[in-house]
């Protein structure tokens, strides 16, 4: 009988224990469910970073596309940029045209040279004043040191000047009915003629008197 009296309470307690024991295995499950949002947050952060990177790439690509489109389509440029682009393009075309014209004229001129003129032209092209001597001369006159660019410029100008004097001397020799080689009298007459034409500046200092 005692066993029969205790059985209801025991039976009532056993289901309670079974419910607790059934509830306890669920505890890790709740812990797992709490951990799932953390993983989703990390995934969300990674997705947002990837989205931001993709957006920046798209923006840079759009900017590059716009600049490329502006280069291809002049109508997208601003008026100042259009004018600058046209000016540089015109300058390049004009310079290229001038260079081509000069080359063509030079080719025609050289093709019409005689053998003697061609030899003289080749000698003139290869000739050059020694830059060290030109530099010493400039420094002795000015009393100051000069740069290499000034020496190169003066050397080229001197070469052109001597070429003009020699050409004028050859004309004098031909006019006098004489044959080359050139003599000092031909050179002196050539310098005199160039001075009379105003192509050689007067080296003598003239005092200007004011009345």
Curated annotation (Swiss-Prot):
Keywords: Acetylation, Nucleus, Transcription, Transcription regulation. The gene is Taf11. It holds the Pfam family TAFII28. TBP and TAFII18 bind to distinct domains of TAFII28. Residues 35-44 have a biased composition (Acidic residues). This is Transcription initiation factor TFIID subunit 11. The TFIID basal transcription factor complex plays a major role in the initiation of RNA polymerase II (Pol II)-dependent transcription. TFIID recognizes and binds promoters with or without a TATA box via its subunit TBP, a TATA-box-binding protein, and promotes assembly of the pre-initiation complex (PIC). The TFIID complex consists of TBP and TBP-associated factors (TAFs), including TAF1, TAF2, TAF3, TAF4, TAF5, TAF6, TAF7, TAF8, TAF9, TAF10, TAF11, TAF12 and TAF13. It comes from Rattus norvegicus (Rat). GO terms for molecular function: DNA binding; nuclear thyroid hormone receptor binding; nuclear vitamin D receptor binding; protein heterodimerization activity; TBP-class protein binding; transcription coactivator activity. Component of the TFIID basal transcription factor complex, composed of TATA-box-binding protein TBP, and a number of TBP-associated factors (TAFs), including TAF1, TAF2, TAF3, TAF4, TAF5, TAF6, TAF7, TAF8, TAF9, TAF10, TAF11, TAF12 and TAF13. Interacts with TAF13 both in vitro and intracellularly; also interacts directly with TBP. It comes from the Eukaryota. Residues 1-98 are annotated as: Disordered. Belongs to the TAF11 family. GO terms for biological process: mRNA transcription by RNA polymerase II; positive regulation by host of viral transcription; positive regulation of transcription initiation by RNA polymerase II; RNA polymerase II preinitiation complex assembly.
């Amino acid at each position: 009988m005692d066993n029969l009296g205790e059985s209801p309470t025991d039976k009532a307690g056993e289901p309670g224990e079974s419910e607790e024991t059934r509830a306890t295995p669920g505890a890790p499950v709740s812990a797992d469910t709490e951990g799932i949002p953390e993983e989703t947050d990390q995934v969300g952060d990674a997705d947002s970073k990837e989205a931001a990177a993709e957006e920046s790439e798209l923006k840079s690509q759009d900017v590059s596309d716009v600049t490329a489109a502006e280069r291809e389509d002049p109508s997208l440029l601003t008026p100042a940029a259009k004018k600058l682009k046209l000016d540089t393009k015109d300058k390049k075309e004009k310079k290229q045209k001038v260079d081509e014209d000069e080359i063509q004229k030079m080719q025609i001129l050289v093709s019409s040279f005689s053998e003697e003129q061609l030899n003289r032209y080749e000698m003139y092209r290869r000739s050059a004043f020694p830059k060290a001597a030109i530099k010493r001369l400039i420094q002795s006159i000015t009393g100051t040191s000069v740069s290499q660019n000034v020496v190169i410029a003066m050397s080229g100008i001197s070469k052109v000047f001597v070429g003009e004097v020699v050409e004028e001397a050859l004309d004098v020799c031909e006019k006098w009915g004489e044959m080359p080689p050139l003599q000092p009298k031909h050179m002196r007459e050539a310098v005199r003629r160039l001075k009379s034409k105003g192509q050689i500046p007067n080296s003598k200092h003239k005092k200007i008197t004011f009345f």
